[in-house]
Amino acid sequence: MARAIGMVECTTVSTGFKAADEMAKAADVEILQAEVTCPGKFVILVAGELSAVRASVDVAAGKYSDKVMDTFVLGNPHESIFPAIYGTAQPEKIEALGILETYDVAALIVAADLAAKTAIVDLIELRLAKGMCGKSYMTLTGSVSAVPVSYTHLRAHETLRH
């Protein structure tokens, strides 16, 4: 598992392809995902050592700042992030269900990581801006008391209040 992941979300497809190329050349990172999302945005998800991921994201964010919607770097992503992104998560049972919807992909992944780290919940799915006019959503499950706790932490997190 990578020690860090980072994302750049671009407003245009052409910028996304150029940014992905710059990111791969700037540092020793693995491109996990580089694809078009709705409505014509482009998302690049990279993994690697923290310093490499940060350098890679910074290069794209700096060079294409007028076309970058959002970015993030997570130094120690929760292990449940990837199964939720790739649709392979299999929670043992579903008790209470939590759903969070965002307008950008980066904020959703940061929110999912925070939710998984601050409450005893299982991420079910992270739907990343496909088929929803650019919106993203996540579903998670946990006890009737744990799911609201995760959302309390999300509401308090400064970068997620938009």
Where are these regions (language model features)?
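Short amphipathic alpha-helix segments
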Residues: 14-26, 107-120
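Short, low-order "capping/linker" segments at domain edges
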Residues: 81-96
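The feature marks the first
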Residues: 2-40, 44-47, 51
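A short linear hydrophobic-aromatic micro-motif
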Residues: 29-34, 70, 122-127
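Short glycine-/aliphatic-rich beta-strand segments at the starts of folded cytosolic domains
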Residues: 2-10, 92-102
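Conserved small/polar residues in nucleotide/adenosyl-binding loops
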Residues: 152-159
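A common structural junction motif
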Residues: 27-28, 61-68, 119-120, 155
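Helix N-cap motif at beta-to-alpha junctions
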Residues: 47-53, 141-147
